[in-house]
């Protein structure tokens, strides 16, 4: 099937993917008086006396906003708010289908960090949570951190943390299959945007010690003078041999071809076709290849297997081991809303990844991660998101 043509046809047929549906009957004067005037005044009075009652009397308890400025949409880049709206609608459909959560797509016609933060703070009283989506790095880091500290509802940038959680879950099962230990494996992360940074931080929290990051210029290391503040921070936690001795052979300076040699795991959140078969052959025995660029991965699975890969995962649904955020974000917000979690912590993210990995009872190279359609996946992630 030509999914591009079919998608365009269906989007036009249905005028998008969402509609508003009433939960209550409105068939007569009594209904009108109960659900609108004069009856609606009573829940208003109760909420005015105690704002926490808004969770009892309105949609807030099970409703989130999916918010984007359209600057980092899929593999399309900065296409603007209107062009990003179909993705935000789709995200809302997934929240409803997999977690039963009401979600509203909101696209903002500004790239200004202060304006985005102020706008979200102004509309936050309607929502029980905020899912940030497709906002480019490095602005996305400040926006998320500021909102987390200034709002009293959970805020998550899914491109960062959803990707990181599903990636870690795949690695946990991959290590079981290859009989390698997290303390010993050497990882390369190709791509230093929102996803790459969050993946790296979560892997380090999990206990992985040796990570090298590569951007379009080359490896991240202290000797580079072109690094933004986020990449500067990464020089303290990745490619750490460079901190001890920049002239050491363990300090990797160069491009992807140099950085991938002798690595156990390649994680790509970068660009199509950048990983060659020769690069895969230069890795350690039984390497794992997580080629997550969409829609075309860093290397096609067939080529990776031919070059000796033991496990291959991509972001695509037409290959095994699809590392898709839909395995994570419905459960994260279901748990957060149900358990009244204000802040989604690192410990919760680690637990969510472990739960997702353990959901696959007997992982094999062709199945290191479950399908989002398997019953129980959402609840296994949601159970990790609780206070205490």
Which residues does each predicted region cover?
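Adenosine-phosphate binding glycine-rich loop
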Residues: 158, 291-388
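Glycine-rich phosphate/diphosphate-binding loop of Rossmann-like nucleotide-binding domains
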Residues: 74, 81-99, 157, 161, ...
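General beta-strand structural signal in soluble alpha/beta enzymes
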Residues: 105, 131-134, 155-158, 189, ...
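N-terminal ligand-binding/catalytic initiation module
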Residues: 1-155, 388
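Rossmann-like adenosine-cofactor binding region
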Residues: 232-311, 316-318
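Solvent-exposed alpha-helices and their adjacent loops that cap or buttress functional pockets
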Residues: 12, 55-60, 96-97, 122-124, ...
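Flexible, glycine/charged-enriched surface loops at secondary-structure junctions
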Residues: 133, 181-185, 213, 362-369
């Amino acid at each position: 099937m030509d999914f591009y043509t079919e998608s365009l046809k269906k989007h036009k047929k249905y005028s998008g993917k969402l509609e508003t549906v009433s939960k209550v009957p409105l068939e007569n004067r009594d209904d009108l008086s109960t659900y609108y005037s004069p009856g609606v005044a009573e829940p208003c009075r109760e909420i005015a006396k105690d704002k926490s009652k808004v969770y009892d009397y309105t949609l807030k308890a099970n409703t989130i906003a999916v918010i984007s400025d359209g600057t980092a949409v899929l593999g399309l880049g900065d296409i603007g708010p209107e062009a990003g709206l179909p993705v935000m609608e789709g995200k809302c459909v997934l929240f409803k289908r997999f977690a039963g959560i009401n979600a509203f797509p909101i696209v903002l016609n500004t790239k200004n960090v202060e304006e985005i933060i102020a706008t979200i703070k102004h509309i936050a009283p309607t929502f029980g949570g905020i899912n940030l989506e497709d906002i480019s790095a490095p602005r996305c880091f400040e926006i998320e951190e500021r909102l987390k500290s200034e709002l009293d509802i959970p805020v998550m940038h899914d491109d960062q943390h959803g990707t990181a959680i599903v990636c870690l879950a795949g690695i946990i099962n991959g290590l079981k299959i290859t009989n390698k230990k997290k303390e010993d494996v050497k990882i390369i992360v190709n791509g230093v945007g929102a996803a790459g940074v969050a993946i790296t931080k979560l892997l380090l929290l999990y206990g992985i010690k040796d990570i090298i990051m590569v951007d379009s210029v080359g490896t991240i290391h202290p000797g580079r003078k072109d690094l933004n503040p986020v990449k500067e921070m990464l020089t303290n936690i990745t490619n750490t041999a460079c901190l001890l001795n920049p002239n050491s052979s363990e300090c990797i300076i160069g491009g992807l071809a140099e950085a991938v040699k002798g690595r156990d795991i390649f994680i790509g959140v970068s660009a199509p076709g950048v990983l060659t078969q020769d690069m895969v052959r230069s890795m350690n025995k039984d390497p794992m290849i997580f080629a997550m660029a969409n829609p075309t991965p860093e290397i096609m699975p067939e080529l990776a297997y031919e070059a000796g890969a033991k496990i291959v995962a991509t972001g695509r649904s037409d290959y095994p081991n699809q590392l898709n955020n839909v395995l994570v974000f419905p459960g994260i917000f279901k748990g957060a809303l149900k358990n009244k979690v204000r802040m989604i912590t690192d410990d919760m993210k680690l637990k969510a990844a472990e739960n997702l990995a353990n959901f696959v009872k007997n992982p094999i190279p062709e199945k290191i991660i479950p399908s989002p359609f398997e019953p129980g996946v959402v609840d296994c992630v949601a159970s990790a998101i609780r206070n205490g």
